[in-house]
Design a protein with these regions (language model features):
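A short amphipathic helical element positioned immediately N-terminal to and/or at the very start
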Residues: 153-167
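Conserved residues at the C-terminal ends of beta-strands
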Residues: 8, 35, 135
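Catalytic donor-sugar/metal-binding loop of nucleotide-sugar-dependent glycosyltransferases
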Residues: 116-137
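Acceptor/aglycone-binding surface of glycosyltransferases and processive sugar-polymer synthases
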Residues: 4, 16-100, 105, 140-151, ...
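Acidic donor-binding loop at a coil-to-helix junction in glycosyltransferase catalytic cores
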Residues: 108-117
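Short beta-strand-to-loop acidic/aromatic patch adjacent to the donor-nucleotide binding site
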Residues: 2-13
Length: 167
């Protein structure tokens, strides 16, 4: 029975000590989302190619535009849509858990679109979100999704784009 829930990739790309950086923000917000876009925190040779960095950035800005507000240049400032490393308050997650269903198709939300869904649904529920830079290491082992390959990466980018536009 925890008050804070953390999610992360299971491929060694995240460092648990970044939780010490993330958790204090929960005194001012509901969810802290990581970004892998700050170069000084990324290990050389990781899977974030130029395509991944810029694709994530532009998709993040599309979400910002979708939920734009004139206050503080928007509701959220994002640079990375695909980072699953995040922490959320238990009571905030409870506002979302009954809705892990695509409201258009009725299908459960999972897979690569899950981080997008968490972010977008949180915005719609008026949860306060902040993004913080995290350490990003080289992946241990092979990618199960093959998203580090150019064609697969483009396919994932198009899946993300479609999800953002239709959700």
């Amino acid at each position: 029975d925890a008050n804070i829930i953390a999610t992360a990739e299971a491929d060694g790309t995240n460092n648990a000590y970044d939780l010490d950086k993330m958790i204090p923000y929960l005194s001012n917000c509901d969810m802290v989302v990581g970004t892998r876009q700050v170069q000084i925190f990324t290990q050389k040779g990781n899977q974030n190619s130029i395509m991944h960095v810029w694709g994530n950035y532009w998709l993040a800005k599309l979400i910002q535009f979708k939920y734009f507000s004139l206050h503080h240049f928007g509701i959220i400032n994002l640079t990375d849509v695909g980072c699953l490393f995040r922490v959320i308050k238990k009571e905030s997650l409870e506002k979302l858990t009954d809705k892990f269903i695509d409201h258009k198709t009725g299908d459960a939300i999972g897979g690569p679109a899950f981080p997008l869904y968490l972010t977008m649904r949180s915005i719609e529920k008026d949860l306060r979100i902040v993004e913080v830079p995290l350490t990003f290491n080289k992946r241990l082992g092979q990618s199960k999704t093959r998203s580090d390959e150019k064609i697969s990466g483009i396919k994932y980018g198009l899946i993300f784009l479609k999800f953002i536009l239709r959700y």
